[in-house]
Amino acid sequence: MLGVSPAYFFSRFTTDFTVDDYIQGLELLKSEGFSGFQLEIFHRSRLNEWLSEAAALAKRADDLNMEATQFVAHFLLAATKDEASLLSDLGLEDMKQVTDITAHFPRCRVITLPLSPFSFQAGSSFDIDSWRRLWDGLCEKLLAFASIVEASGRKLALEIVPGSLLGGTEGLMRFSRETGNKSVGYNFDTGHAWSCKENIATLPAKLAGRIYGTHLKDNFSYENLALPPGEGNISWDSVIDGLLRNGYAGSFDLEIACKTPAEVTAAYAKGKATLERVLGASKYR
């Protein structure tokens, strides 16, 4: 399946998009040849709107035979942004409401939690006890989020943003080793991984069975951009072959951030053409 991340919707309608904007966007997506889309609440102020109007969006998606591939809880970046937020219950009750919204989309089995760049005062330093307190707090909070998501019958994926306390995929592996948790997975955001200096070609094998979704975008590894695949220097043959070779059966979802709505159709068409070419040429498909 080829789909799009929420970047499609905020590129068309700004980050203050409404549920009605999503419905309009689905109709455009259908005409552009996509069959998957990702749900998102960008601003917490929209939470009640989504609680009351998600059913209408789900009905329109069914009418168009469009499938929600994951829910990105973008507004929950706040839950891991700094020490005070991290070491509190911030976001846990909101995640329960996210599961209520996602329940309107029975085929949507993944909820993605983006991890915020971690903030601290300029000039701050940490001793080993301070670091351990933060790390333990992060592990505890991720387990709490996972418990809520899994109680709804879904899986939790992490979107590892550059600068987050988790650090990268090695942080996810460490979390798994230290807590024994094997169910929390990874939303493979190629742009984030590449700008974190990850060895991107190895990630599908390294996290085989733990990649629950994708945000497929390009950049040049030194800036966290969201360009169409083919406009940066990511090796897309390696990424796509690796995913297929290691059993990934989910949607291939583009994430392209456009500066103006007028650019959206062409940018996503270009990205889609690149993915179709690479998928079509893969010997692992």
Where are these regions (language model features)?
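N-terminal small/glycine-rich loop or linker at the start of catalytic domains
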Residues: 1-13, 70-81, 118-125
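Active-site acidic/histidine proton-transfer and metal-coordination neighborhood
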Residues: 23, 60-63, 80-185
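Histidine-acidic metal/acid-base catalytic patches
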Residues: 1-35, 58, 62, 80, ...
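Short beta-strand segments at enzyme active-site cores
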Residues: 37-39, 68-73, 108-116, 156-159, ...
